[in-house]
Amino acid sequence: MIILGIDEAGRGPLSGPVVAAGVILDPEKTIDGLADSKKLTEKKRQSLYEVITAHAKAYTIVEVSPQQIDQLNILQATLKAMNQVADNLKGQFDKVLVDGNKLPNWDYNSEAIVKGDSKVQEISAASILAKVHRDNICLEHDRLFPQYGFAKHKGYPTKEHLENIRKYGVLNIHRKSYKPIQLLL
């Protein structure tokens, strides 16, 4: 059975997109070191990202913008991204395994697995792709808006990030539907 593993990154931050990734691994090849992306160092994630993208049978990465998150809400934006991931790889898998406890409303043979990023290698691989991709977006945001410190906090609601928003203002990459941002508008 060919498995498509899906995971997301970036539901909690105040800025940037939510990112979903899907990975189909070659069952003949194992990738050592796969784990939940949150349990890996940044260097290890980057190294595994290169290995996964080079050796996966197929993968895709989907972003949903802060503006779409504001229109839909974060749950619906995440489900939309996951749905797009599956549609992008349609016909290449038998079953979809998704990290978490919610599935998009779709017709795919699928299962939601709580802590799937620690249990299923395809989900672990998707977790790594989503996290590295989103972190790279945050590094680009840091280059564009260095005074906000995106390289450090990756958009999460840290004390520093909130202080910088107060000091420099809300950007178009901030999620305006999120309460901490609404309070600063």
From Swiss-Prot:
Q: Which PROSITE patterns match?
A: RNASE_H_2
Among SUPFAM superfamilies, the record links this protein to: Ribonuclease H-like
- Please tell me where this protein is predominantly located: cytoplasm
For this UniProt entry, what's an example GO CC term? ribonuclease H2 complex
Where located?
Cytoplasm
Disulfide bridge positions per record: none
Q: What is its EC number?
A: 3.1.26.4
Q: Which CDD domains match?
A: RNase_HII_bacteria_HII_like
Give the GO terms filed under biological process for this record: DNA replication, removal of RNA primer; mismatch repair
GO molecular function list: manganese ion binding; RNA binding; RNA-DNA hybrid ribonuclease activity
Q: How is the cofactor bound?
A: Manganese or magnesium. Binds 1 divalent metal ion per monomer in the absence of substrate. May bind a second metal ion after substrate binding.
RNase H type-2 domain segment(s): 1-185
What keyword terms does UniProt attach to this protein?
Answer: Cytoplasm, Endonuclease, Hydrolase, Manganese, Metal-binding, Nuclease
Q: Catalytic activity, per the record? A: Endonucleolytic cleavage to 5'-phosphomonoester
**Which Gene3D superfamilies does the annotation name?**
Ribonuclease H-like superfamily/Ribonuclease H (3.30.420.10)
Residues annotated to bind a divalent metal cation = D7, E8, D99
Q: Which cofactor does it need?
A: Mn(2+); Mg(2+)
What is this protein's function? Endonuclease that specifically degrades the RNA of RNA-DNA hybrids.
Please report which protein family the annotation says this sequence is part of: Belongs to the RNase HII family.
Q: What is this protein called?
A: Ribonuclease HII
